[in-house]
Amino acid sequence: LATSSAASDVYKRQPFNKVIVKVKRMGGGFGGKETQSNLFAVVAALASVRTGKSVKIRPDRDDDMIMTGKRHPFYIKYNVGFEKNGQIMAVDALLSANCGFSSDLSGPITDRALFHSDNCYFYPNVRLISRPLRTNKVSNTAFRGFGGPQGMMLAERIIQEIAFFLKKDTLE
């Protein structure tokens, strides 16, 4: 059985040594090749078993973009306590991530968002909670930054709001 994916094992329980996987190239952005190729792999495997021939799947870019996940959108609610000089004293935040219909890599991604939520700043008192949410959307996945940018945006937003409140420049 020749296919472009080891997923062919799922249909006929072929031993792995009977499955030939051929991949011409794996270029492009980080993340989509970790788990998001499963949909295409299963289709190729089923078609290969059904026809007894090798199968090539090449979705056009529009279909690929519709069917595969993107960066996790986050909704972040937070409270921050700070001194008159702008020094942050406490941060309490809930980071909710739209994970889509499956967990995929959402756990590590939401964890990494937490780890980067202070960016380069120091919070002497902090409570950060991540909430991965299952929704009816396409499952989101690993993307360049792997949750880090979402966490850093929290820190930068806090700095912006403190500066605005104190009528100062964010660089002060």
Regions found by a protein language model. Give the residues of each.
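Single conserved hydrophobic/aromatic residue that forms the stacking wall/gate
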Residues: 1-7, 11
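Short, hydrophobic/aliphatic alpha-helical segments
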Residues: 13-25, 131-138
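Beta-strand segments within the central parallel beta-sheet cores of soluble alpha/beta enzyme folds
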Residues: 17-25, 52-62, 89-94, 123, ...
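Glycine-rich loop/linker segments at domain edges
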Residues: 73-158
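Glycine-rich and small/hydrophobic secondary-structure elements
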Residues: 31-84, 140-165
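Phosphate/pyrophosphate-binding loops at sites that engage ATP/ADP/AMP, CoA/4′-phosphopantetheine
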Residues: 9-21, 163-169
